[in-house]
C-alpha cells in the first residue's frame, strides 16, 4: 500500500460546532497522521480559486458564500491510501445518505453545510495541498 497525502478541510459549520478535536481523533484512529494544519478565514478570491473546478455548476456561488462565512481548519493527512481512507471517514456528501458513524452523518446538517471537504483523487490532493501549503510547510512524522 502506498503512503499518500490528502487535503482535508473542516468547514465553517463544523468549526462553529467546536468538533475539530473529535474529527482529528477520527483521522488519527484511522491511521492518518496530520502533517500540516492551519486555521484560516478564506477570502472570496481564495475560495473562488480553490473551487474553480465547480465554477459552472449551479451551487458554486452558494459554496463560495458558505466557505467564506467563517474560519475553516485546513490539514494535510498522511497515511496508507490516505485519499480513500479520508473519503470513507467523511461519508457521502449528503449527510442524510452518509453511513452511520461517518463524519458527515455525525456532524453535518445538510448537503451544503456538510462539515468537511476531502480531495477526491491523488492528483487532486497534490494540487489542493500545494494551494494551502506551498513550499516546505509539511513535516513528515
Swiss-Prot record:
Q: Which keywords has UniProt assigned to this entry?
A: ATP-binding, Cytoplasm, Kinase, Magnesium, Metal-binding, Nucleotide metabolism, Nucleotide-binding, Phosphoprotein, Transferase
**Assembly notes:** Homotetramer.
Location of the active site? 117
Q: Name one GO cellular component term.
A: cytoplasm
Localization of this protein: Cytoplasm
- Binding of ATP occurs at 11, 59, 87, 93, 104, 114
Name the record gives this protein: Nucleoside diphosphate kinase
Any one GO MF annotation of this record = ATP binding
Q: Which domain of life is it from?
A: Bacteria
Reactions catalysed according to its record: a 2'-deoxyribonucleoside 5'-diphosphate + ATP = a 2'-deoxyribonucleoside 5'-triphosphate + ADP; a ribonucleoside 5'-diphosphate + ATP = a ribonucleoside 5'-triphosphate + ADP
Instruction: Please give the HAMAP family that the UniProt record associates with this protein.
Output: NDP_kinase (MF_00451)
- The gene coding this protein: ndk
Q: What is its EC number?
A: 2.7.4.6
Listed CDD domains:
NDPk_I
Q: Which GO terms describe its biological process?
A: CTP biosynthetic process; GTP biosynthetic process; UTP biosynthetic process
Q: Which Pfam families does this UniProt record tie to the protein?
A: NDK (PF00334)
Function, in words? Major role in the synthesis of nucleoside triphosphates other than ATP. The ATP gamma phosphate is transferred to the NDP beta phosphate via a ping-pong mechanism, using a phosphorylated active-site intermediate.
Q: What cofactor does this protein call for? A: Mg(2+)
Q: What is its main location?
A: cytoplasm
Protein family (similarity comment): Belongs to the NDK family.
Amino acid at each position: 500500500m502506498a503512503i499518500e497525502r490528502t487535503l482535508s478541510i473542516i468547514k465553517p459549520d463544523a468549526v462553529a460546532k467546536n468538533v475539530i478535536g473529535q474529527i482529528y481523533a477520527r483521522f488519527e484512529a484511522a491511521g492518518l497522521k496530520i502533517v500540516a494544519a492551519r486555521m484560516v478565514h478564506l477570502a472570496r478570491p481564495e475560495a473562488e480559486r480553490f473551487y474553480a473546478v465547480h465554477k459552472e455548476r449551479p451551487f458554486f456561488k452558494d459554496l463560495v458564500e458558505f466557505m467564506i462565512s467563517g474560519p475553516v481548519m485546513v490539514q494535510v493527512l498522511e497515511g496508507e491510501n490516505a485519499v480513500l481512507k479520508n473519503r470513507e471517514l467523511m461519508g457521502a456528501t449528503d449527510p442524510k445518505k452518509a453511513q452511520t458513524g461517518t463524519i458527515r452523518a455525525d456532524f453535518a446538517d445538510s448537503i451544503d453545510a456538510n462539515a468537511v471537504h476531502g480531495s477526491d483523487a491523488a492528483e487532486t490532493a497534490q494540487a489542493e495541498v500545494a494551494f494551502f501549503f506551498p513550499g516546505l510547510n509539511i513535516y513528515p512524522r
